[in-house]
C-alpha cells in the first residue's frame, strides 16, 4: 500500500500575525474592523503559500493601514486550541517599535476592512481590544524585553521559569 502524500497527513494549523505599532508618546495603534466586533491590531492570516509570520505581519499592516513596517521583534506566540466557534491555531505578535508622527499622520485605511483607527494609551487599548488580543498585548507589555508563550491566552510555565 502506498502511503498518502505528506500534505494529506500532516495537520494544518491556521496562523495569523499582528503588529504592535506605537507613536513616540507611547500610544498604541488600534483598528476597528468592519467584519467583526471590537477593536484589533494591524495584522491578519498567514498565507498558506509559504508566507512567514513576519511577512504576513508586514503585508497585512501595509494592506490595512498603508504603513511599511521595516522592523519587528517577536514578543508573543499564542497557541489556540480549536473550539466550536473558532478553528484554533497559532497567533504571532511582533513589536514593530515607534513610528514618527509623519508616518502615522499618513495612514490610509483599507475601507472595506477597517472603518477607523486610533492611537490610545495601553490601558485604553486593553479595554477596547477583544479578549484574545488583549491577553497577548498585556503579556507583551508585561515582559517588554522577552518573548511570551501563551496557550489559549494564558501563560505557560516550564522548568526554565523556575531558575533564579
Predicted segments with their positions:
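Conserved beta-strand and immediately adjacent loop positions that scaffold enzyme active sites
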Residues: 18, 27, 116
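Nudix hydrolase/Nudix homology domain
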Residues: 37-39, 111-164
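Unchanged
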Residues: 46-70, 79-132
Amino acid at each position: 500500500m502506498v502511503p498518502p502524500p505528506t500534505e494529506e497527513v500532516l495537520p494544518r494549523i491556521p496562523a495569523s500575525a499582528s503588529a504592535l505599532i506605537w507613536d513616540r508618546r507611547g500610544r498604541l495603534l488600534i483598528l476597528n474592523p468592519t467584519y467583526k466586533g471590537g477593536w484589533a491590531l494591524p495584522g491578519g492570516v498567514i498565507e498558506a503559500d509559504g508566507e512567514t509570520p513576519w511577512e504576513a505581519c508586514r503585508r497585512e499592516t501595509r494592506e490595512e493601514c498603508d504603513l511599511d513596517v521595516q522592523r519587528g521583534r517577536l514578543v508573543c506566540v499564542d497557541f489556540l486550541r480549536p473550539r466550536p466557534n473558532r478553528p484554533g491555531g497559532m497567533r504571532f505578535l511582533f513589536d514593530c517599535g515607534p513610528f514618527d508622527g509623519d508616518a502615522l499622520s499618513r495612514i490610509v485605511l483599507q475601507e472595506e476592512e477597517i472603518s477607523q483607527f486610533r492611537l490610545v494609551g495601553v490601558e485604553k487599548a486593553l479595554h477596547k481590544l477583544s479578549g484574545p488580543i488583549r491577553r497577548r498585548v498585556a503579556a507583551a507589555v508585561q515582559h517588554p524585553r522577552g518573548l511570551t508563550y501563551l496557550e489559549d491566552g494564558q501563560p505557560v510555565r516550564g522548568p526554565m521559569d523556575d531558575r533564579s
